[in-house]
Amino acid sequence: MSTKKIMLKSSEGKTFEIEEETARQCQTIAHMIEAECTDNVILVLKMTSEILEMVIEYCNKHHVDAANPCSDDDLEKWDKEFMEKDKSTIFALTNAANFLNNKSLLHLAGQTVADMIKGNTPKQMREFFNIENDLTPEEEAAIRRENKWAFE
């Protein structure tokens, strides 16, 4: 049985073919298909070819049907290996999952980031997320006093 295919086009103009049913894991794409906003080519201008290709790889692996059986343990192992990427790629995948409204990929990426910062000090977290500290030493001390339990 032949399945309907659609094309996704990245910000650089590279196109990727994917089964429509698989692409529907991304609610943004599903809504575009249902609203007939596409002529079988969907522009995904907010992401590079590299990131779009990773999203498609994830969707293909997570598409469940009789032809693609995968145990939960195998999928969990695959997910862990899939997320073994540098920080900027993980952030880009998180943004892509959010934009495309792919809840399972967003959860996986978010959990990966959470695991990366687990146990970090506030200073380490600011460095990790490239956030400037705009608190005075007095404000920091007040926060530490008010939330003493969190710093023990």
UniProtKB/Swiss-Prot annotation:
Transmembrane segments: none
Coiled-coil regions listed: none
Listed GO biological process terms: auxin-activated signaling pathway; jasmonic acid mediated signaling pathway; protein ubiquitination; response to auxin; response to jasmonic acid; ubiquitin-dependent protein catabolic process
Region (Interaction with the F-box domain of F-box proteins): 94-152
Localisation: Nucleus
Pfam family, one: Skp1
One cellular component (GO) term of this entry: nucleus
Top-level lineage group: Eukaryota
This protein's UniProt keywords: Nucleus, Ubl conjugation pathway
SMART domains: Skp1
Xref: InterPro entries: SKP1, SKP1-like, SKP1-like_dim_sf, SKP1/BTB/POZ_sf, Skp1_comp_dimer, Skp1_comp_POZ
Gene3D superfamilies with a match to the protein in the record: Potassium Channel Kv1.1, Chain A
Pathway membership: Protein modification; protein ubiquitination
Tissue: Restricted to siliques.
Function: Involved in ubiquitination and subsequent proteasomal degradation of target proteins. Together with CUL1, RBX1 and a F-box protein, it forms a SCF E3 ubiquitin ligase complex. The functional specificity of this complex depends on the type of F-box protein. In the SCF complex, it serves as an adapter that links the F-box protein to CUL1.
SUBUNIT field: Part of a SCF (SKP1-cullin-F-box) protein ligase complex.
Family: Belongs to the SKP1 family.
UniProt name for this protein: SKP1-like protein 8
Lineage, uppermost ranks: Eukaryota, Viridiplantae, Streptophyta, Embryophyta, Tracheophyta
